Amino acid sequence: MSLNLDKITPELIEKTIREKNIKFIRYLYIDLDNVIRGRVSTAKNIDTDLRGGLTLAMIMQSGFSITDLAVSGTIYGPRGEVTLIPDISTFKVLPYVDATAAMIVEQYVGDKPHEVDPRPKLRGYLKNLGYEFKIGIEPEFYILKKSPRGVIEPYERHLCFSTEGMNA
């Protein structure tokens, strides 16, 4: 079954989950360093997740560095949580992971978009220019092979965007 993204509804998502035997949903967001991050929830929680979102500690936006500790008086101090609100138009059954689907989420603090979430900012910029916001995540992928010993390894050992790869 192919989803019509112009007509996707929570009911259609729930039906797809049942028909495709989806067990897990990945809720994905892009951080300020353009790294895909996310949370995983069981598919049985889809109704609750779509109605109320999921929570994430605000400190998770700090960069995951030991030097980025929760310090009072900063945006990442003990302020609570952001709410991840799923964008149902981005629902996709993942063909490369068994029984798993994914959706992009937007981050909210209370009822306002979180100031470090790039999606609402881009949507606003595009609206000011007269454009419509339609964007997804660029997935990274790897080509692998099985070695003679049966070990899965990279097909190519050269680094991407490195001059070393140009000498192959």
Task: For each feature predicted by the language model, list its residue ranges.
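Glycine-rich, acidic/polar active-site loops that bind/position phosphate-bearing ligands
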Residues: 2-168
